[in-house]
Design a protein with these regions (language model features):
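Extracytoplasmic cysteine-anchoring/structural motifs
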Residues: 1-51
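Surface-exposed repetitive/solenoidal architectures
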Residues: 47-359
Length: 359
């Protein structure tokens, strides 16, 4: 058969399209297309290939409903379709499947919107010598900071980046974009820039995100982000996973329960409870704190409780963080203060004290 588009319709190989099919005396007709020269198939039978996603050409959105679909869409992005939108329609189990991060580097960064719809991605595993590792390798860029990842739960991930100057995070290795309402559990391990959610957040924002992942790195290491720089903001984020710094013996070191090196523009209503430990020594500066390793900005209504007595190891900002000691400061006090600060900032995010810790 052949397609005769009535409008300027482009049908791409490897994509799926939905049409209304009408059967009449003269043949089959589709809305917007005509099928002609129909020939019977000679008695063969079979099933169409299931790509694991549906495609809406009007919105450039791929709706993914299984693991193969997510892997196929990742291939599309890494093959050059970097601005497509991706939506999860089901929980996705990647257990036993090798994962190649979406957006391989700056020149092939993902610039669309990924909406997890509150669904869970389970068992994502990355072991790579490439520079960027995570669900996304590289998110956004200088020309397009509108890239967004939101509403996804990353459960039981195992990310290992062996590149000597690598960037590793549960959601993204390197981000210029927006990351919102994402949570991470499992483990993230790398070298230079390592965080439970992102390795580096440059500009853009991380809002309402959390990590219980165990994080291990060597230079800039944090429970949520290894490093924040330039216009980056962190709002209503928390980390409960342990952070371990295997100190590089010649480099300046920054490690913290929330962020290793904090030099964005805003850090508001965040907390950290995971223990922060280190091994080794360095000829450079070593700054390791319960909340932040290095800080260069104003920190508002932030708290920590872990094995460190010092919340910020090296503080060039104008404010400090508060330790929850259970006597002078409780988590009830912290929730009240964090929510007041969020309200004053015009944010819709709020904490609730569910059990021992706020969520």
């Amino acid at each position: 058969f052949y397609f005769r588009p009535q409008n300027d319709v482009v049908l791409e190989a490897g994509s799926r399209y939905k049409y209304t099919v009408k059967v009449n005396a003269t043949g089959l007709t589709l809305e917007g297309c005509t099928i002609g020269s129909w020939v019977d198939g000679g008695g063969e039978s079979g099933e169409a290939e299931d790509l694991g996603y549906n495609y809406d050409s009007n919105t450039k959105t791929y709706t993914v409903y299984n693991a193969d679909g997510l892997m196929n869409v990742a291939e599309l992005v890494n093959g050059g379709k970097t601005d497509i939108n991706i939506t999860l329609d089901k929980n996705i189990d990647l257990t036993g499947k090798g994962w190649t991060p979406i957006g391989t580097d700056y020149d092939n960064s993902y610039t669309g919107t990924f909406d997890g719809g509150g669904h869970t991605i389970t068992g994502l595993t990355v072991t790579t010598n490439d520079e960027y590792a995570g669900l996304f390798g590289y998110l956004g860029n200088f020309n397009n900071g509108a890239a967004t990842v939101k509403n996804v739960v990353m459960d039981g991930i195992q990310i290992t980046c062996n590149h000597r100057s690598g960037y590793a995070g549960g959601v993204a290795g390197y981000s210029w974009g927006t990351i919102e309402n994402c949570s991470v559990s499992g483990s993230v391990s790398g070298t230079m820039y390592v965080g439970g959610v992102v390795g580096v957040q440059r500009d853009g924002s991380i809002t309402g995100c959390s990590s219980s992942a165990t994080v291990k790195g060597t230079i800039k290491v944090g429970g949520v982000a290894g490093q924040t720089i330039f216009g980056a903001t962190l709002t209503a984020c928390y980390a409960t996973g342990n952070v371990n710094i295997e100190i590089d013996r010649t480099q300046d070191i920054s490690g913290g329960g929330l962020v290793g090196f904090n030099d964005g523009i805003s850090l508001l209503s965040c907390y950290a409870t995971g223990n922060v430990t280190s091994t080794g020594s360095s000829t450079g500066h070593v700054h390791i704190g319960g909340f932040l390793g290095d800080n260069y900005i104003t920190v508002t209504a932030c708290y920590w409780k872990n094995n460190h007595e010092q919340g910020i190891s090296y503080n060039r900002g104008s404010t400090n963080v508060t330790k929850v000691d259970g006597t002078n400061v409780t988590w009830e006090n912290a929730v009240d203060a964090m929510n007041t600060a969020l309200q004053n900032a015009g944010s819709e995010w709020r904490y609730e004290l569910n059990g021992a810790l706020p969520t």
